[in-house]
Amino acid sequence: MAVDRKIRIAVVGGGPGGVIAALALSKSPNVEIDLYEAATAFGDIGLSLGMPWRPWRILRLLGLQGYLAALLPPDQIPKEDVTVPTIHYRKSDQAVGEDIFTCTSLSGYTRFRRSHFHAALLPHLPSNCKTYTSKRLVSYAEPSNASDPIVITFADGTTAECDVLVGADGIKSPTRASMYNYAADEAEKAGRSAEANDLRSKIRAKFSGVEVYRSVISAEQLRAAAPDHHAFRCPTQFLGKEKVRMPTYPIQSENSQFLNCALYICDYSREGEDYPEPWVTDVEAKDLRSSLPDWEPEAQAAVSCMGEVVSRWAICTLSPLPFFQRSRVVLLGDAAVRVTTPFSTFSSDHCQTLACYDELPRCRLRPGDDAYILSEILTHPAVTRDNVQKALEIYSEVRVPMSTHVLESSRRTGMDCALHDEVAAADLKSLGERMQQEMVWAWEWNPEDEKKKALDLVEERLV
């Protein structure tokens, strides 16, 4: 990377993925970074963040793990080489529930409040990284000349310039909209109308068929109704064949006197529909309390503790994207792949982040993975302002296959959690084994292998 011409990088989106990317990239003295956040303050939007083995390891590889470890008591710092029980699954749509399996994973599952996460990392941004709030991206202008800067436009009417744009701006990403509109226009001009239509269809997220009704419930109230409730021993998912599932787990708080309870209503016949705004809204809970009449007492007890009003979340997702890069613009995190549950926490998206303990391995996984690979590529000494587009092509080439796997695996596991396949649900032992197997890639696939693949391509093409 040429020292006499620094690469100006704009990171749009101040969620976990954007912050990690900015920190990792800013370690190079040959870049200048502007980090833009749409909200009035970093960490203002979103609940807690879940972190299993893979993102925890990536933070260590990036030299950032210690900042978060300082927030934890010594006995709660994850051990990367220890397998621990993480989530317990039960079939609960009957008078006496049945255990399905207990998911185990390396290092377990660590949670942080979003505000604590940002407070721990943001002070370590060096002087070559400037931060801005109340800057919501509207679009960017793709330059006709490779040497000209990218112009980005914000909702307040201001503009900025950069050499590289990193869109970490969530599932409703304006970066993705601009990128895929440019690609579609190009295909249209070349007479490829079907391709243009397909590209435009990838811009807007579609309904997954899952609505989540979320509530924070009192641990004291639940203990009075069910003193031996499974949720007090281990985060638990109660599953039912009526396409319903309910995770219940202690919420991240200073005194742990509350639990997060969520009721998932799954109708996969609606998968792929356009879901009207807003995706998140408050609704009355009275109908939910009577929605599990034949379920085991523990499940009914948890629902009975929900408040009068609950938050309804429509889980929307993206169809697989064929590329995460165009020109000198890349997509990161939910802007590139928004997976359905159960792999959808530690999200960079502001409107759609679910801090559910049932959602095991996604990074919570993907934004960190993306930031890790992108930073390793762009901080390679061979990358310059003149060849940075070729470097970004490598990022897309490496990340798309892995991200597509996560998307597909997430969908399969989400359906298993909803007992969607009645044949599979009839054999609980086999179902549990299948669900566990769908998750093991999250700690068996080493992120350093993906880094090696990326850097080998940099050496091959740019050196």
Curated annotation (Swiss-Prot):
Top-level taxon in the UniProt lineage: Eukaryota
InterPro entries (UniProt xref): FAD-bd (IPR002938), FAD/NAD-bd_sf (IPR036188), FAD_monoxygenase (IPR051104)
Positions contributing to FAD binding: E37, G50, R114, D334
Single GO term (MF): monooxygenase activity
Recorded metabolic or biological pathway in which this protein acts: Mycotoxin biosynthesis
Function: FAD-dependent monooxygenase; part of the gene cluster that mediates the biosynthesis of strobilurin A, an antifungal polyketide that contains a key beta-methoxyacrylate toxophore that targets the complex III of the mitochondrial electron transport chain. Strobilurin biosynthesis begins with construction of benzoyl CoA by step-wise elimination of ammonia from phenylalanine by the phenylalanine ammonia-lyase str11, oxygenation by str8 and retro-Claisen reaction to form benzoic acid, which is activated to its CoA thiolester benzoyl CoA by the dedicated CoA ligase str10.
EC number per UniProt: 1.-.-.-
Enzyme class: oxidoreductase
A GO BP annotation: secondary metabolite biosynthetic process
Catalytic-site annotation from UniProt: R200
Presence of keyword RNA-binding: no
Transmembrane region(s): none
Name of the protein described by the UniProt record: FAD-dependent monooxygenase str9
Family according to the record: Belongs to the paxM FAD-dependent monooxygenase family.
Stimuli inducing this protein: Induced in strobilurin-producing conditions (on CGC medium after 6 days of growth).
Origin species: Strobilurus tenacellus
Summary of the protein's practical applications: The structure of strobilurin A was used for the development of the major class of beta-methoxyacrylate agricultural fungicides since its beta-methoxyacrylate toxophore targets the Qo site of complex III of the mitochondrial electron transport chain and prevents adenosine triphosphate synthesis. Compounds such as azoxystrobin (Syngenta) and Kresoxim methyl (BASF) are among the most widely used fungicides worldwide. This class of antifungals are used as effective treatments against a broad range of destructive fungal plant pathogens and make significant contributions to food security.
Keyword NAD: no
UniProt keyword annotations, A-Z: FAD, Flavoprotein, Monooxygenase, Oxidoreductase
